Amino acid sequence: MNTYRTAIIGYGRMAHGHAKAYQEVGLPLVAVADISEEALARFRDQFGQRQMYTDYRQMLDEVHPDIISVVTHDQLHCPMVVDAAERGVKGIVCEKPMAMTLKEADRMLTACRLSGTQLTISHQRYYTPQYAQARELLSSGAVGAVRSAEAYLLPSCIHTDGTHTIHMLLSLLSNPRVLHLLAQVDGHSGHVYYGHRVEDAGVAFIAFEQGIHAHLNWGLASHQPRTPLHPSPDFRYHGFIIHGETGRLELDGDGPVGDRPILRIVRGTEIEAVNLRPGKSSIRLEIEDLVSSIETGAPHPLSGQNGRDVLEVIIGIYESARRRRVIQFPFEVKENPFLAMCEAGDFPS
């Protein structure tokens, strides 16, 4: 593996994992940029002195990193990715969600295509053992042909955290083409998350090719007291049930619930626990695949186009809620329908 000089834009909570992963892969981390001097001092305390910047463009112009991580609020992903691509960065790890709108996502993809930059969107749970083995089991026919799926998210919104839920649902189903969806969201509380308004709860029905359909359920029925929309959320952060012809696969998300196996196959009254393999850091594996994509040109499992596909489902959910109708795929919506609904006063408190 060649040596690539790396840098990080935005040093918040998630950025520590990126910095550690670069060290584990053996790539020199040469610079970090953040508008907060306090954040830069925290990085220095954790990883030692590097080139420090409060202006990310200045860092890109002076350091010329080969690979960067964009670990900032959602609204900043597009301009930062475009600026890096236009300056010749070879690889970009962009935190999820990809962007605020499909227009921004398309701008990012175009900039990276023109510069030859490999872009990956950090849906890193793709690499964790329970999700990787769940994909393998479904692909091998462990429950027969897949017919339907249930996906759950607690407590957050479909855009900022549910992007993981959508991504994992699509990957568990082998990325089928979306035909149409119908959805509704509740945004009455005015909750702000990572710098922008988000919904409190929502539901969606998605129809895929090959006759597969999925139901999504996320968020809170109330904040005080905190009451989940789903009456019995026995999962950790995300939860999935995949129904097949001969059984179902159940996945409890990011951690076990009580003594129950986190991943299991259910056939009638029989429950088969799946033993999980040891796993490496998911961000480390994402970066290793990015290096491989840079050197071989092979598509990354978490490519920018894959990230756009996930964002299209999210925007479709918001557009269905705004228009109160079924949304056929593909569609042309360049704004963020949820934010448009907020600006129009569609969510009275």
Feature annotation, model-predicted:
Residues 128-148:
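Rossmann-like NAD(P)H-binding beta-loop-alpha module
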Residues 147-237, 243, 305:
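Rossmann-like dinucleotide-binding domain that binds NAD(P)(H)
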Residues 194, 210-286, 303:
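NAD(P)-dinucleotide binding in Rossmann-like oxidoreductases
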Residues 62, 66-67, 73, 78-126:
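Beta-strand-loop-alpha-helix segment that lines the small-molecule cofactor/substrate pocket
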Residues 31, 51, 67, 91, ...:
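Short, Asp-centered acidic motifs that coordinate Mg2+ and/or phosphate
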Residues 1-47, 169:
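N-terminal Rossmann-like dinucleotide-binding module
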Residues 1, 27, 67-70, 106, ...:
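C-terminal helix-rich "cap/oligomerization" subdomain common to oxidoreductases
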